[in-house]
From Swiss-Prot:
Belongs to the glycoprotein hormones subunit beta family. GO terms for cellular component: cytoplasm; extracellular space. Expressed in placenta, testis and pituitary. One of its GO terms (biological process) is G protein-coupled receptor signaling pathway. The gene is CGB1. This is Choriogonadotropin subunit beta variant 1. Encoded by a cluster of genes that have evolved by duplication from LHB. HCG-beta is encoded by six non-allelic genes (CGB) clustered on chromosome 19q13.3 and named CGB1, CGB2, CGB3, CGB5, CGB7 and CGB8. Two specific hCGb proteins that differ by three amino acids in positions 2,4 and 117 have been described: type 1 (CGB7) and type 2 (CGB3, CGB5, CGB8). The CGB gene first arose in the common ancestor of the anthropoid primates. SUPFAM superfamilies: Cystine-knot cytokines. Keywords: Disulfide bond, Glycoprotein, Hormone, Secreted, Signal. Residues 173-187 have a biased composition (Pro residues). GO terms for molecular function: hormone activity.
Length: 187
């Protein structure tokens, strides 16, 4: 199937006028195609820009500092680890009362390794070893209550639960009289 070029004579005279006279170089069909291509390009780039990292970071391992304490030990320390955090695509129904709720996915651990540290200053009879998770990879999935705290964030996730260790400073380092925690070799 061949296409025929559109000539200026085929376009109505009122569309070919420029400041009251006929433009002999009028190219409306090509300009319209250029505008469509430009619009398509801008729309496709807009979708790309909206999904870039700074705007909505996806579920992935990130560095985090967590407070570690153990009942019976007089110390609360912080450890650097990786946790799973970020956005997962979710949907909700407009008519929630009529239709059942959709399952919501959250950022979960996919592969995890556990590391252990020895808390300093624990009295005899209290095991000083504490283990914590290190996220190797993450995934968006239903919340597994067996391995994940599905509730909202704690008011102060980097603080210790024991009121003796809660103070106005953000430092959770062990007291200077106690040695630093020692890392134990992984399994």
């Amino acid at each position: 199937m061949s296409t025929f070029p559109v000539l200026a004579e085929d376009i109505p005279l009122r569309e070919r006028h420029v400041k009251g006279r006929v433009d002999p170089h009028f190219r409306a069909p090509k300009m319209e195609m250029f505008q469509r291509l430009l619009l398509l390009l801008l729309l496709s780039m807009g979708g790309t820009w909206a999904s870039k990292e700074p705007l909505r970071p996806r579920c992935r391992p990130i560095n985090a500092t967590l407070a570690v304490e153990k009942e019976g030990c007089p110390v609360c320390i912080t450890v650097n680890t990786t946790i799973c955090a970020g956005y997962c695509p979710t949907m909700t129904r407009v008519l929630q009362g009529v239709l059942p709720a959709l399952p919501q996915v959250v950022c979960n651990y996919r592969d995890v390794r556990f590391e252990s540290i020895r808390l300093p200053g624990c009295p005899r009879g209290v095991n000083p070893v504490v283990s914590y998770a290190v996220a190797l990879s993450c995934q968006c999935a239903l919340c597994r209550r067996s391995t994940t705290d599905c509730g909202g964030p704690k008011d102060h996730p980097l603080t210790c639960d024991d009121p003796r260790f809660q103070d106005s400073s953000s430092s959770k380092a062990p007291p200077p009289s106690l040695p630093s925690p020692s890392r134990l070799p992984g399994p």
